[in-house]
Amino acid sequence: RDVERSRGLGDVYKRQFVFSNLKKVIKSKTKGTERKELMELFTVINDYNNFSRVLRLKKYYNLTPEQIKNNLLYPFSSISEKTLDRMCRAESSGEVFSVMQETHTGKLIEQIGYVYASDISPRVKYKLARKNMYFSNNPSVVMISYMFVAETELMNIITLIEGTRYKLDSKKIQSLLIV
């Protein structure tokens, strides 16, 4: 069990390393609206990754609030530590959702359709990337957004292939696609 915990923390350390280096690169290589848009994009993505992680760790792993907090990336979140703490201490998934929806970032949950809670993070990422791809004036923001959209479309192709392979109903397959 300690091996599982340390493996999970290794994942957290890797994600912290990636996000801290990403933040350094953005701050050193960009300025103005480009910096603001890139930081906002990655911060919102991390906020929803933290949200999904809280839901998953509560539901499937029954971890304590302290263990859940150790698996989150606080420094790269626009959600306050106090709010993340409330999410970790929530008794049910519904309570986690309501705490998230109280935040500025959490308002996107109402705008996207999702079947499973794990769908929320990729759907938000796709929605933001599509918006940035069309409306940003900064080439780096458009490029990273395009990469996120391409990644999502590849996931959709895989979902279609697997759904067909396992003979799922077309309505079920359609509900799993991120559009």
Model-based region annotation:
Residues 2-13:
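Single conserved hydrophobic/aromatic residue that forms the stacking wall/gate
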